[in-house]
From Swiss-Prot:
Record-given protein name: Exo-alpha-sialidase
Family in the record: Belongs to the glycosyl hydrolase 33 family.
pH-activity profile: Optimum pH is 3.5.
Protein purpose: Sialidase is able to release sialic acid from a wide variety of natural substrates including bovine salivary mucin, colominic acid, bovine fetuin, a serum glycoprotein containing both alpha-2-6 and alpha-2-3-linkages in a ratio of about 3:2, and glycoproteins and glycolipids from thermally denatured human lung epithelial cells. Does not show any trans-sialidase activity since it is able to remove terminal sialic acid residues but is unable to catalyze their transfer to the acceptor substrate.
Organism: Aspergillus fumigatus (strain ATCC MYA-4609 / CBS 101355 / FGSC A1100 / Af293) (Neosartorya fumigata)
UniProt lineage: Eukaryota, Fungi, Dikarya, Ascomycota, Pezizomycotina
Length: 406
């Protein structure tokens, strides 16, 4: 009889709408901490490499926790301006130990570089951690004199050419990996021919995170497709799953029902574009009227699968502005509905500009949610030279659930 009651309770929890869930996490003491992790050139103690190379701005964050518990935070280090083209390196920071969970600025190692060879554009970090702790890091790259729309002016006065479908002029997809907890990285391998459709010019992987499925495969979201890793951990072979209607920047999670959930940036301001499926196929993408979005990247995280199962989503919850960052929880088996959540501005970061834009999340070893979020100083009238930094936030479920509007 007791087991039957438990089964009935589990079914009720699964099918109740998000607003009806009495989450036991709400009774815990709310916790939140935050500080700038990637400090732009206009800030006190700006982040530089050990070589002395500094960066005007940092953008496009990604964060993962390895199987040892160490946290790796990635970003684009933009050398001369905040813009999407020109000399951009892929940089990162690690927590000093596997147990400190990045709780304070002193818990992080200094800035390092994954790759920055040449004056080209390295970006869109999209890591995924395998069962054997191999960290696969997918990257996008294009040549120094190319940009997405062309006719942009580099610091030396060179006018960029528009990215095209030639081998020299197209966006390339690279993969690097680490087998020592992110301490060192292999030379990036160009997988464009294998994993990017023929004839494409522009391309983007992630940015954000890949995932490991309960069935063992790895899945990395990319423009118009998923990249699938099959085979033994640390020795994966990669293939492509095309997705009709998918966006240029996608996020992915395996929901509690075992299905895959793509939540993509819309091509225009409005609402997030969502589709559900499996490795065998996806349904159609459709706007989610409950998730407004200003045509920006977002991030999604499966926090846990046991009852009450929780899926976390973070974006700018506005159809017009990137400054409305809000974190939400869904209790639905398919992440159909998210609660109101909590605005990140409830815990503002002093002296770090105007928070909002791209983000990435991971679950820390002490059961917190760790989130990297962009911040823009908007201290230049044209926006071209406005400095960009990246904030690190740690908060628990109770902090979300005890928000003033939840």
């Amino acid at each position: 009889m007791q087991s039957m009651r438990f089964m009935i309770l589990a079914l009720l929890v699964q099918f109740l709408p998000a607003w009806a869930i009495n989450d036991p996490a709400k009774s815990a003491a709310p916790y939140h901490d935050e500080f700038p992790l990637f400090r732009s050139a206009n800030m006190a103690s700006p982040d530089k490499l050990s070589t002395g190379i500094g960066f005007h701005s940092f953008r496009i964050p990604a964060v993962v926790r390895t199987t040892t518990g160490r946290i790796l935070a990635f970003a684009e280090g933009r050398r001369h301006t905040n813009q999407d083209f020109g000399d951009i390196n892929l940089v990162y920071k690690r927590t000093k130990t596997t147990a400190n969970n990045g709780a304070s600025p002193s818990d992080w190692e200094p800035l390092r570089e994954v790759v920055g060879s040449g004056a080209g554009t390295w970006g869109n970090p999209t890591p995924v951690v395998d069962d054997d702790n191999t960290i696969y890091l997918f990257l996008s790259w294009n040549g120094a004199t190319y940009s997405q729309n062309g006719k942009d002016v580099l610091p030396d006065g060179t006018v960029t050419k528009k990215i095209d479908s030639t081998w020299e002029g197209r966006r390339h997809l690279y993969l690097t990996e680490s087998r020592d907890d992110g301490n060192t990285w292999s030379k990036p391998v160009d997988l464009t021919k294998e994993l990017t459709p023929d004839g494409w010019a522009w391309d983007a992987v992630g940015p954000g995170n890949g995932i490991r499925l309960t069935t063992g495969e790895l899945v990395i979201p990319a423009m118009g497709r998923n990249i699938i890793g099959r085979g033994a951990p640390g020795n994966r072979t990669w293939s492509v799953q095309r997705l009709s209607g998918a966006g240029a920047e996608g996020t992915i999670v395996q929901t509690p029902d075992g299905k895959l959930y793509r939540n993509d940036r819309p091509s225009q301001k409005g609402y997030r574009m969502v589709a559900r499926g499996t490795l065998e196929g996806f349904g159609a993408f459709a706007p989610d009227a409950g998730l407004p979005d200003p045509a920006c990247q977002g991030s999604v995280l499966r926090y846990n699968s046991d009852a009450p199962a929780r899926t976390i989503f973070l974006n700018s919850a506005s159809g017009t502005s990137r400054r409305a960052m809000r974190v939400r929880i869904s209790y639905d088996a398919d992440a159909k509905k998210f609660n109101y959540g909590r605005k990140l501005e409830d815990a503002k970061v002093s002296g770090a500009g105007h928070e909002g834009g791209y983000s990435s999340m991971t679950k820390t070893g002490d059961y917190k949610i760790g989130a990297l979020v962009e911040s823009d100083f908007f201290n230049d009238g044209t926006g071209k030279n406005s400095y960009r930094a990246i904030i690190w936030r740690r908060f628990n479920l109770s902090w979300i659930l005890n928000g003033p509007n939840n």
